[in-house]
Amino acid sequence: MGKYFGTSGIREVVNEKLTPELALKVGLALGTYLNGGRVVIGNDTRTSSEMLKKAVISGLLASGVDVIDIGLAPTPLVGFAIKLYDADAGVTITASHNPPEYNGIKVWDRNGMAYTPEKERELERIIEEEKFKRAPWNEIGQLKQANPREEYIEAIMKEIKLDNSYTVVIDPGNGAGSIISPYLHRELGNRVITINSDPHGFFVRELEPNKESLSMLAKTVKALKADIGIAHDGDADRVGVVDENGEFVEYEVMLSLIAGYMLRKYGKGKVVTTVDAGFALDDYVRGLGGEVVRTRVGDVAVAEELMKHGGVFGGEPSGTWIMPQWNLTPDGIFAGALVLEMIDRLGLIGELAKEVPRYVTLRKKIPCPNDLKAKAMEEIAKLIPREFSYEREITIDGIRIENDDWWILFRPSGTEPIMRITLEAHTKERAESLMEKAEKLVKDAIKKASS
């Protein structure tokens, strides 16, 4: 990670590390880097988003860059608008699934792909040196407002076709997806019920769509006998799914199902995922004639590998999916529509999920200050061989150790002050035993790093 940018742009607590002053410098740095051109900018529903957006816009205009402000917008709408308006870059003001006190700044290139670490380091260099381009009075950038929502919905409807109508419950989590996702599904011919769809910055539920945070969605689907529940995080770059039985569909299962559907739809090819994805994806994709490629965590890494390998689909086991035939921006709204197309062609999720191999996946977050992460990872690397016997090690992002029937990933979060442990085993007992050892190892490593 750089000084400002992590695995998903800048993401910090507002008015502590992420201030209007820093946002202004990011705008100036991006404008200096682009040296002219046009930038699309949008924001999520957080109370601080307008403040930060205006600061970024000021920096861009001051450096001579024209800005198209599309207002309240989910991340995928920004990615779509970059191409629609032939922009040179895009900026999203969002902290995605982080708590409401956080916000962030994420930059996208002209192809809708997140800025690579190399480009982010260049922006950091410009910020640190403060050698900003400042346009003369008669060359200051122009600011325009636009609303590409209708064009976005129309474009999705050209890609997604349903032969039948479904009852869909949508939970956008009071985020930016509230302004599009329900309307899209109505246009697709579905009966739509919404919960948590008021787009305010005081979120009713935890923004990360998981089994616990989507308990109300699950109850609603079951009570209404709906066909499916669709959920998003704060900026709708993710999708979470509840099946027709009111059961949350684990991310590993959904990742396998949608990867399989993309292989059926577009033909055999490579599926790109991250080091925290489990064995089920490999087994399922291999059975359909596909191949899995792994990379570091983060949508930009997935997008890079998709371009490198000409992959048919890229996804993380967090509900973050990239459909390269559509865009290189992770798009939870398009993904939700794609899930409906899949059940329209193949059957309801609860039945489809039975085809996916089931292993036990456990995840744990352990608090760790950002400035201790590097030292803690050094200590973890020393302790792992003493505590575990394993056959393979992968170090492209954190440390992943593997045997044929289990794996563990130790990784510092790029967006929060935590260490993440993700593991998978064939049985619950084995998984819990491994997690107990792994958790103790990480806590010991953090303790050593802090002494």
UniProtKB/Swiss-Prot annotation:
Modified residue Phosphoserine is at which positions? S96
- Required cofactors, per record? Mg(2+)
Domain of life, source organism:
Archaea
| EC assignment | 5.4.2.10
Catalytic reaction annotation: alpha-D-glucosamine 1-phosphate = D-glucosamine 6-phosphate
Cysteine-cysteine disulfides: none
- Isomerase keyword on record: yes
PTM text: Activated by phosphorylation.
A GO molecular function annotation here is: phosphoglucosamine mutase activity
Query: Has the keyword Magnesium been applied to this entry?
Result: yes
Swiss-Prot/TrEMBL GO biological process terms: carbohydrate metabolic process
Q: What class of enzyme is it?
A: isomerase
Spans through the membrane: none
Which PROSITE patterns does this one have? PGM_PMM
The Swiss-Prot or TrEMBL record describes its family as follows:
Belongs to the phosphohexose mutase family.
What is the protein name for this chain? Answer: Probable phosphoglucosamine mutase
Organism listed in the record: Pyrococcus abyssi (strain GE5 / Orsay)
